[in-house]
Amino acid sequence: MNKTFSILTGLVMTLAASLCAAQAEDAPKVTVTPIKGPLYMLDGSGGNLVASIGDDGVLLIDADYAPWVEAHAAAIAGIDPDAASPRFLLNTHWHGDHVGGNEHWGTQGTVIMAHENIYQRMSTRQEMKALGRAVEPSPAAALPVVTYEDSIAVRFNGDVIQVQHFPTGHTDGDSVVFFTEQNVVHIGDHVFENAFPFVDIGSGGNVLGYLSNLEKVLAMIDDQTIIVPGHGTSLLSKQDLQEWVTMLKSSVSRVAALLQSGRTVDEIAENGLGVEYDSFGQGFIKEPMWIGFIAASL
């Protein structure tokens, strides 16, 4: 009897340990990439975060999806075990993969900052027709409490963080964040590394505005600037950004020329833009959708 009980107990303990190990493997894991000084890129499931961690505390750029909040908190604790909840959180735009964690941090007392258009979109029901979904208003704790129309400056952890609104690009509320002392830029969803970008036409985005914004950013940075993309695993250089912009501009020119020749959007999508663009359509936005964004923006 005792021997049987011991065997059963051992089996139960082994099964429990296996389940715990499986759960640990399935738990969200954030990849931490040191950038420079107090700055770190946190790569989870949605848009990339930048964390400034230092004597003034923690400041976050973007918040990923809600289920990833604890993973990001653990990543921050791994960098600095004494770090408290972020003092500030700044959203680059309103999409859920960038603001999903807002509610959690808002209830912890984090001051959330964003462009006024982000507040307006988060506080009202939004239709994302390109993706076939509706987004309900966010809870009060998730909403920005500090908003701006053009720009805002934050002095934190020895840096002057310049936040500049770039309208009519990815959406109508996007900001690019310049860490001026470190020469680091979080460019938000104005960059999808090695992929066609999502341009949210229904939220005031426009492909031509997107390209115009990127040209402006290129004029504001130098060859030593480190760029954090909204999506992607790599830190980028000015040259990387220039090459990506060149690809996007050439695809826009090709679609415009085909439309001018009498081709329909469906015909262009069916025939494709050419093998040189194939690799860029392997991400979230496939080539036919990118062609549609271009046509809707011309």
Protein language model regions, located:
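Cleaved targeting-peptide boundary
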Residues: A22-V30
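Metallo-beta-lactamase
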Residues: G57-V58, Y65-P67, A153, V160-S250
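Bacterial N-terminal signal peptides that target proteins for export
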Residues: M1-V12
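Accessory terminal helices/loops
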Residues: L15, L19-Q23, A219-I226, T233-L298
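Divalent metal-coordination and catalytic microenvironments
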Residues: P38, S52, D62, H93, ...
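Active-site neighborhood of phospho(di)ester-bond hydrolases with catalytic His/Asp-centered motifs
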Residues: I61-A63, S85-H95, M113-E116, H186-G188, ...
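Active-site HxH/HxHxD metal-binding segment of metal-dependent hydrolases
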Residues: A77-A153, D172
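Conserved beta-strand hairpin/beta-sheet module of binuclear metal-dependent hydrolase folds
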Residues: V30-I76, V177-F179, N183-D189
